Amino acid sequence: MKNNKIYLLGACLLCAVTTFAQNVSLQPPPQQLIVQNKTIDLPAVYQLNGGEEANPHAVKVLKELLSGKQSSKKGMLISIGEKGDKSVRKYSRQIPDHKEGYYLSVNEKEIVLAGNDERGTYYALQTFAQLLKDGKLPEVEIKDYPSVRYRGVVEGFYGTPWSHQARLSQLKFYGKNKMNTYIYGPKDDPYHSAPNWRLPYPDKEAAQLQELVAVANENEVDFVWAIHPGQDIKWNKEDRDLLLAKFEKMYQLGVRSFAVFFDDISGEGTNPQKQAELLNYIDEKFAQVKPDINQLVMCPTEYNKSWSNPNGNYLTTLGDKLNPSIQIMWTGDRVISDITRDGISWINERIKRPAYIWWNFPVSDYVRDHLLLGPVYGNDTTIAKEMSGFVTNPMEHAESSKIAIYSVASYAWNPAKYDTWQTWKDAIRTILPSAAEELECFAMHNSDLGPNGHGYRREESMDIQPAAERFLKAFKEGKNYDKADFETLQYTFERMKESADILLMNTENKPLIVEITPWVHQFKLTAEMGEEVLKMVEGRNESYFLRKYNHVKALQQQMFYIDQTSNQNPYQPGVKTATRVIKPLIDRTFATVVKFFNQKFNAHLDATTDYMPHKMISNVEQIKNLPLQVKANRVLISPANEVVKWAAGNSVEIELDAIYPGENIQINFGKDAPCTWGRLEISTDGKEWKTVDLKQKESRLSAGLQKAPVKFVRFTNVSDEEQQVYLRQFVLTIEKK
């Protein structure tokens, strides 16, 4: 009997070891992976072969991972180096002949970490770090390399730039996940854009940039410093020399990769011939002269297909005139869009080179009241050879953005093996391992953007959507709903509450919790409201129903308070959560159950939820999908970040739900030039219109309404020409009844 127990114990241990060896999961997934059903222990004593010649950043990582003692004569042999080094010369044929490729082998005799170049060796170490678990390594042979040349992040969003500490954390995260590019281009950095792009950084900011460059180098990331001069650049020698001087100052700070952005501008800065001449001058007089410049990238003015003039030659001019080594960025068919084969073929044909993709996800600078924590999907997985780079534009919430960044790292390294859901789950487990299930629950219901000017949406709450739809349909029709669907919703709300509490108390990743806290509070209130609404549906008796009704109204008030006091940015202020499936389900169920109660008891309970009573109508393409917002007695159109092309005769109109005394209208088109092209009108019936005079101070337009009755407000381009403006502000203030 004793021998049988020993045999069973040994069999279990062998099974565990075999399972560990077989279930090797790596992110990003390698191009070629062979796993043996064996493991080895991390050596207690080892000989390091090639440590003095190999990439020092890789050697540093290796020594941090090894807990054993280094010896010159005994112990397991660990060979590390780059192709051509003596230490790994016999493995030259095994090393993939690709930039940043590597060969990794683990067996009982030797560990080999061999890169095609220094960065390849560093990436071999990142894979080695993932293989090492609890002091054990599976026997493997890996041949790996990236499918896309440049992979990373562009900090190119509008709003609050990342903090210095957040950027340092990001750069380390990129290195671990085999991303080689960080493009520094925050829209609100005054020394990146007009008018201060000509000026040097103050000492404090310069020192921080210098530290970022150093940390980027340690983690094998190209720090790409971008300049955004197009809004006020003069096409003359003086400005050209000032730009080159700024690049030289950044070079002295350690920067070795550069970008010039011409996005979201209007005026003479949009001239493609002049842009090409400037970039070529930078390339020939700066980038090619320096022996160590890595990347030179430009973002064009027409950076997506929908903004490209079909009758113009902007993109073809860049394709013909720009030096071949200069990369050209592209966001896809629209500002916010996924990358398709047809789309990338269209742009590559015009720019005569593979596009450098600027993917605008999970950026939320046009839906700042939402968190975008869902999976990365929608991009073609067969077009790696058609693009030179793939960088993601993140949220202003740096830590929260890592969920998508992790997934983009996996996609860009090996699109053919990219697994949307597995990568998303791995990302969450990497970012918050101690509460991965709770973060997954929160992220599952915080992935959609809500209605927005770009019309870009994401799936959300997919696991309960069928049950929610079936239940709501049956309940609204007065039919018996499926008990299993009802219980699914009950469990979902219970799990949401639990997850919220656990996340709020988590201390493992404090920066993440600080970022998401307002949304987590709102998430919990949403779940509590859902539970109470379901209890109203069960409707035991009149007094019980009224108790739950009063509680729901109190929860609505708490949610309104959070929405009005947290995340009060000037564009899309507030906190929205679970907006695609769960919140509409709760609101519609509440409205229906209150209607049934009122009919049964001849009552007049208010069934109002947070709906939008007013409407906005426009035939201006970039405005027509922008959501309306209500803040106290103000009705405002959500601002747009990009240049709005307002055709002659087109208009924007706000229709209120009733006639109100009007107080004033505030408009800002981001232009100091006199707004002689526009006409502002008000109406009570949408038929008879009264023109309202506008006063202008710099770019701000205002009109006092002196409590004139108003239900409709309309602004029209009455000129004969298209106007290019920025919709910074459009606010109607009324006197509430």
Curated annotation (Swiss-Prot):
Changing N393A: 95% decrease in activity for pNP-O-GlcNAc. Optimum pH is 6.0. Inhibited by 1,2-dideoxy-2'-methyl-alpha-D-glucopyranoso-[2,1-d]-delta 2'-thiazoline (NAG-thiazoline) and O-(2-acetamido-2-deoxy-D-glucopyranosylidene)amino-N-phenyl-carbamate (PUGNAc). Not inhibited by Streptozotocin. Keywords: Glycosidase, Hydrolase, Signal. Gene3D superfamilies: Chitobiase/beta-hexosaminidase domain 2-like, Glycosidases, Golgi alpha-mannosidase II, Hyaluronidase post-catalytic domain-like. It catalyses: 3-O-(N-acetyl-beta-D-glucosaminyl)-L-seryl-[protein] + H2O = N-acetyl-D-glucosamine + L-seryl-[protein]; 3-O-(N-acetyl-beta-D-glucosaminyl)-L-threonyl-[protein] + H2O = L-threonyl-[protein] + N-acetyl-D-glucosamine. GO terms for molecular function: [protein]-3-O-(N-acetyl-D-glucosaminyl)-L-serine/L-threonine O-N-acetyl-alpha-D-glucosaminase activity; beta-N-acetylglucosaminidase activity; identical protein binding. The keyword Iron does not apply. A protein binds at G156, K187, D263, Y303, W358, W359, N360, D365, N393. Transmembrane segments: none annotated. Changing D264N: 99% decrease in activity for pNP-O-GlcNAc. Residues 1-21 form the signal peptide. The active site is at D264. Residues 149-416 form the GH84 domain. Pfam families: CBM32 (PF18344), Glyco_hydro_20b (PF02838), Glyco_hydro_84_hel (PF21809), NAGidase (PF07555). Its EC number is 3.2.1.169. Residues 148-433 are annotated as: Catalytic domain. Belongs to the glycosyl hydrolase 84 family. Metal-binding observed in X-ray crystal structures is artifactual. Can hydrolyze the glycosidic link of O-GlcNAcylated proteins. Can use p-nitrophenyl-beta-GlcNAc and 4-methylumbelliferone-GlcNAc as substrates (in vitro). NCBIfam families: GlcNAcase. Homodimer. This is O-GlcNAcase BT_4395. It comes from Bacteroides thetaiotaomicron (strain ATCC 29148 / DSM 2079 / JCM 5827 / CCUG 10774 / NCTC 10582 / VPI-5482 / E50). The lineage of its organism: Bacteria, Pseudomonadati, Bacteroidota, Bacteroidia, Bacteroidales.
